[in-house]
Amino acid sequence: MKKSSIIDVPRKHDQEDLFGIERYQEALSEFIRNADTPLTIALQGEWGSGKTSLMNALRFSLCDSDKAPFYGIWLNTWQYSLLSTPEQTLIRIIEGLTNKIIEIIKEKHQNKAEAFAKTAMRFFKKASVEIAKIGADKLISGGKDVIGALSSSDEKEILLNDFRDELQKSINELIKYEEEKATGKNGILFFIDDLDRIDPPVAVQILELLKNIFDLENCIFILAIDYDVVIKGLKPKFGELTDKNEREFRSFFDKIIQLPFSCQWQVIRLKRS
């Protein structure tokens, strides 16, 4: 029996490419293979435009295939936000990324992973307290900056820097090990999905956290987020978008994103049977 319904499920790498994504995936994969780090790429497009499908293809090509050059870490931000306050969402995402990194490092350097985990625990304990102090209302209204709260004193600044330094050292040692073993692995690719399903002001806070904490050598972030979501998320801070303040919105986006990549495919091919 033939079926004729349309489902909203991202394309897997081994499914037929009805949207013509493959040529874009190949070009972007080649760019990523040769890119300097750190780097953040934004896959832009409306919800349902194929951002997750493209990320699936990139993950298979660059992380899961034979002799893939990157470790891959996938994080669905919307799932982390379920049944969580905005403050809890931010902490859960930082912890989620960090734990996934620790899992990779632990395979090669058990002692290094344990040492970094201790530093991470101290940071999470303090960060949870400081972010909770901000409160959901101020997070959503843009009245308080998360990174500012985490580095508003010498003690907090040292704690944040220690976390970043230990994370960078651990990743560098992992890549050095891979080079010595000639495995072909030379970095970590982070796939951050479904940011456009989160409340826009919270999504903007997540972007700032990623930039200030995880902007590291040997790391490339691929974000599924549209510029319109960033605009909505920045309205509490900058007001309605106008010709006069458009530069402020664009400057924030450009500060976070080095390569915007549009997923508005010019040709959509639907196979009819």
Model-assigned labels for residue ranges:
Residues 243-273:
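Conserved P-loop NTPase catalytic core
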